[in-house]
Amino acid sequence: MATLTDVRNALQNAWTDDMKKAVKNAYRNAEKRASQGGNYAKCLEQASMQGTPYSLAAKKCAIENNLASTLSGLWGTS
């Protein structure tokens, strides 16, 4: 699963502005999907079991789940 650290690293390692823009767009799209989709509910449940402030933890988890597929699509990896 991609993490927010992976996004930061991808931005630091991107060698063109186009790649940086693609990573930023992937993050924004993942963030939008996180607030709309089923990942959010699943992550809310997971966060509440961990006893963390669940709205932030769930949003972060859902964004990371969505980023995993988006970033792998950008680089053609799984």
Curated annotation (Swiss-Prot):
UniProt keyword annotation of DNA-binding present:
yes
Location comes to: Virion
Q: Which UniProt keywords apply?
A: DNA-binding, Viral nucleoprotein, Virion
Q: Which GO terms describe its cellular component?
A: viral nucleocapsid
Q: What does the record give under GO molecular function?
A: DNA binding
This protein's assembly is summarised as: Homodimer.
What role is this protein assigned? Answer: Completely wraps the viral circular dsDNA genome to form a nucleoprotein filament. These interactions between the viral genome and the nucleocapsid proteins probably maintain the DNA in A-form. This certainly protects the viral DNA under conditions such as the extreme desiccation of its host.
- Provide the protein name: Nucleocapsid VP1
What is the species of this protein?
Answer: Sulfolobus polyhedral virus 1 (SPV1)
